[in-house]
Amino acid sequence: ADARELRLRVQVNTSITRRNVHQIDAIAGLLAAQGIAMWSVFFLVPVGRGVEEERIRPDEYEMAFERLWHHAQQQRYAVKTTEAPHYRRYVLQHGGNPLAAPRPEQSAGAPPTPGAHEVRPAEGSPVHLSKHRAPLGVGDGKGVMFVSHSGEIYPAGFLPLLCGRFPHDSVVNVYQNHPAFRMLRDPEQLKGICGACEYRRVCGGSRARAYAVTGDPMAAEPDCTYVPQGGPVV
């Protein structure tokens, strides 16, 4: 049966690559016609099957952010990004508020209220979409950890820094006290332009992408075009 007929809220996940980065508007329109509740947009980290040749250019991120922010304001469904924390910086630069509350909760599977144009929370917002949903304010080692099927503990699925092994190691202790987790949660340890950026606390760049490209999880986000302006830290 159609999920909507069962009053289930539907989320659609899309990976942005060189093949579809120029089709964001078309995809957004298609999803609008399907009455979904959430569009989750994933930006590639060049590991595993996320091969380098599918990775978009830094300037294409900005173009993608512009279209996603447009649809976040216009569509009835919410939009969030994964592995693109610099989308929060884009939203702030363009007058949005990544911490803004979403529209009032709809009943399960119901179409959103017509005319609802509240600012949607961008990636990283700590606001809940509902009391049953985990907050969006998570990142590598910050609000999330990954435990493999064989017990290896990592800061995230795309950040293969081995920090322990369950059940020998307590996942709580690893999360709270392992040096890698503590480092990832400290924006003052960021390097390069990320370390100098006034958006380092609200953004901080993709630590998984930095590690995949440079081998250093605290290196600058390799796919960001923003040049820090030396202003106060946001």
Each predicted region: which residue ranges?
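Flexible mid-to-C-terminal extensions adjoining Fe-S/redox cofactors in radical SAM and related proteins
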Residues: 110-115, 152-153, 157-234
